[in-house]
Curated annotation (Swiss-Prot):
It holds the Pfam family E1_DerP2_DerF2. This is Mite group 2 allergen Der p 2. Keywords: Allergen, Disulfide bond, Secreted, Signal. It is found in: Secreted. SMART domains: ML.
Amino acid sequence: MMYKILCLSLLVAAVARDQVDVKDCANHEIKKVLVPGCHGSEPCIIHRGKPFQLEAVFEANQNTKTAKIEIKASIDGLEVDVPGIDPNACHYMKCPLVKGQQYDIKYTWNVPKIAPKSENVVVTVKVMGDDGVLACAIATHAKIRD
């Protein structure tokens, strides 16, 4: 019995290990956000000059032929558009999207080497459809380091 409990505990820990706590900034379409190396509400370290991976599962709130990614970062209170983003979300998931269906988007981009170091970073990621916001998440526990 103890072996089964241990196995179940390890399985749950493995599944949840990269899940990040985020605030929904739309209508609760976000089901989960995964970032390798980031856990729950612990600070997520973003490394300058390195790839950053993000995976989100969301439920489409509209039928849409296209989808666009918008990523903004508030660094020590100054909000900026994140440079180097490929805005075409259809490159990272199958389009068109159907209202009520769940989608998994996996996105990787290189963090610019010139990004300022900061211990106070808030990242907002939006996926936009033909009729507005499909999904939106805010990660408040991020830091930019070398």
